[in-house]
Regions:
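Aromatic-rich, lipid-facing transmembrane alpha helices and their immediate juxtamembrane interface loops
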Residues: 1-226
Length: 226
């Protein structure tokens, strides 16, 4: 199943997004949210390993035009890897603040896209694309295994407090990818259509949600997640 997700954005987008990421990291330090900060940084590095090391160097499916691939993909990975992982972790750890953190990230993604489209004409344009046929099936394997682990845990447990919050995990797994895919499509940064939005939303970030929840549950006493 070959899809070609693509983006075309300018340097102003990158500049503004770097400021946002620094401010968000500073907020986490100020409020002593050190674990989400660490999870975000590790998530960004994991994304970079997959994108630059896997898609660009190993598979050759990632194309970058208008920027140095290493530095551009480092920013791209830290941007989405950091926000995606932070958002999911806080969804599990702070259910009372789900709306606030969700709005913060979604509104930022939309705002920076519109601002850079309107005010970034003087900045260089970077275009990227990525073929998915060579690895989406691998993602599907991890997607199934992750959710199968949670499902069988629920089928085997007799204690309500030990059940995995499947609906909540699925909700954030779908929401994260769908939110930024939709923003990219609506604002014209991504020209790929609805099929790419749906498949990527079902597949990509969602495959990591079960594993991240298992890590969260192992490291902390989970709050009741609805």
């Amino acid at each position: 199943m070959e899809l070609m997700p693509n983006r075309s954005l300018n340097g102003l987008y990158m500049f503004l997004d770097c400021i946002f990421l620094v401010l968000l990291a500073f907020y986490f330090v100020k409020t002593k949210r050190y674990v989400p900060l660490l999870v975000g940084v590790l998530g960004g590095l994991l994304y970079f390993l997959a994108d630059y090391g896997g898609f660009y160097l190993l598979l050759g499916t990632r194309k970058v035009v208008g920027a140095n691939p290493f530095w551009f993909l480092l920013w791209l990975s830290m941007s989405y890897g950091f926000t995606n992982m932070v958002w999911m972790w806080l969804w599990f750890a702070e259910p009372e603040n789900r709306l606030e953190f969700s709005l913060l990230i979604i509104v930022w993604w939309f705002s920076v896209a519109v601002i850079s489209n309107g005010a970034g004409a003087a900045f260089p344009v970077i275009s990227i694309e990525r073929g998915t046929g060579g690895y989406h099936w691998i993602m599907a394997v991890f997607l199934f295994i992750g959710y199968a682990i949670l499902i069988f845990k629920n089928l085997q447990t007799k204690q309500p407090t030990e059940r995995m919050p499947l609906l909540s995990i699925l909700a954030i797994g779908l929401l994260v990818q769908f939110a930024w895919e939709a923003v990219l499509l609506i604002t014209g940064i991504r020209s790929a259509g609805i099929r790419t939005l749906i498949v990527d939303s079902l597949m990509e970030t969602n495959l990591g949600a079960p594993y991240l929840y298992l890590i969260y549950a192992a490291l902390s006493k989970p709050k009741e997640v609805a």
